[in-house]
């Protein structure tokens, strides 16, 4: 039994004594303890060494007191498992080769056995679960098909997604073929993470805001829905969070994927999101990550405002406090610790 199951209770919209908190990228460069490990190894080796991945996954639980751990990995491990060469240089960016821009390229990508090609992530989950010893839940995750598609077609990050959109608009059938292939791997991967011990899954659609509402409905949401349904068919009790970055205008469509929680960017007042969605899903978010550069007073004021905007909890409401995107690498860890402690203390009165 979990000693602290607040995060899972909130996702399932069950009564909680306070609002749980974790933050995206909580295992990362802002922590000196993480940097000490990273100095000895490169990023992908860290992802692929279960003992090290488990160690950095647990660091924020022990150092910051967050209510959930998220497995240390990267969304691009899926692209690599499908046969792409992935280079991640933390300060310089990402390169994937060869870029996928033709039918021949798509055919060349494999649909791997995730237990084989992504076994190191599953091993890291098993080891982390053991070392967490039921202190807090463990989140598994994957990138969404649209985001992994853009990386595959662009061959890296992009400002305007020209190659990805060219394929979408010139040959939508080919685009859907690639999206579908990626999506099938994601479905297998998230199910395998749950088999290995993940207590919840988050799907990250980091480049969601690159698409118009209609294009998002056509090229992104159907695949997220496919992934959620694949997981729910096998593991109906495992909660799923969908984080479609900055898609604040189509929250109802995101909720309609069947997810348990919708991750919010900081561009929307959480009260407005709750009005739109009612309490049919849990809401996760949504403080601007740069607030953590502020004074202790400012951090508390902003966090307090979000808790107040969400308002009083009902018998079937859910809120997981988080940032609207990942914590930035040059944030003072003391500021995150202050945020975590403040949310734990301040949120109780709303429950």
UniProtKB/Swiss-Prot annotation:
Substrate binds at residues 25-29, 74, 151, 206, 325. It comes from the Bacteria. Pathway: Porphyrin-containing compound metabolism; protoporphyrin-IX biosynthesis; coproporphyrinogen-III from 5-aminolevulinate: step 4/4. The keyword Membrane does not apply. It is found in: Cytoplasm. Its EC number is 4.1.1.37. It catalyses: uroporphyrinogen III + 4 H(+) = coproporphyrinogen III + 4 CO2. CDD domains: URO-D. One of its GO terms (molecular function) is uroporphyrinogen decarboxylase activity. Catalyzes the decarboxylation of four acetate groups of uroporphyrinogen-III to yield coproporphyrinogen-III. Belongs to the uroporphyrinogen decarboxylase family. This is Uroporphyrinogen decarboxylase. The gene is hemE.
């Amino acid at each position: 039994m979990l000693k602290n199951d607040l995060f899972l209770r909130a996702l399932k919209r069950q009564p909680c004594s306070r609002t749980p908190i974790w933050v995206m990228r909580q295992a990362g460069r802002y922590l000196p303890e993480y940097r000490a490990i990273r100095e000895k190894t490169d990023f992908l080796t860290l992802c692929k060494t279960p003992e090290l991945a488990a160690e950095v996954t647990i660091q924020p639980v022990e150092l910051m007191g967050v209510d959930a751990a998220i497995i240390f990995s990267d969304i691009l491990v899926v692209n690599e498992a499908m046969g792409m060469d992935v280079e991640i240089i933390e300060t310089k960016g990402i390169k994937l080769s060869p870029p996928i821009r033709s039918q021949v390229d798509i055919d060349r990508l494999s649909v791997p056995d995730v237990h084989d090609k992504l076994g190191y992530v599953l091993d890291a989950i098993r080891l982390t679960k053991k070392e967490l010893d039921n202190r807090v839940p463990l989140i598994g995750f994957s990138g969404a098909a649209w985001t992994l598609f853009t990386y595959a077609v662009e061959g890296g990050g992009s400002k305007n997604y020209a190659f990805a959109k060219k394929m979408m608009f010139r040959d939508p059938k080919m685009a859907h073929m690639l999206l579908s292939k990626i999506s099938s791997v994601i479905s297998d991967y998230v199910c395998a993470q749950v088999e290995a011990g993940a207590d919840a899954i988050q799907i990250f659609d980091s480049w969601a805001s690159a698409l118009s509402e209609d294009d998002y409905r056509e090229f992104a949401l159907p695949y997220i829905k496919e992934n959620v349904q694949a997981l729910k068919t096998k593991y109906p009790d495992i909660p799923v969070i969908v984080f479609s970055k900055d898609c604040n205008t189509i929250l109802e469509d995101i909720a309609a994927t069947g997810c348990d929680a919708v991750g919010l960017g900081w561009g929307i007042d959480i009260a407005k999101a709750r009005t739109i969605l009612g309490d049919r899903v849990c809401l996760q978010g949504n403080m601007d990550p740069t607030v953590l550069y502020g004074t202790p007073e400012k951090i508390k004021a902003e966090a307090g405002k979000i808790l107040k905007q969400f308002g009083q909890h009902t018998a079937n409401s859910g809120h997981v406090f988080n940032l609207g995107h990942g914590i930035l690498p040059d944030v003072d860890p003391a500021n995150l610790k202050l945020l975590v402690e403040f949310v734990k203390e301040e949120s109780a009165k709303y429950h």
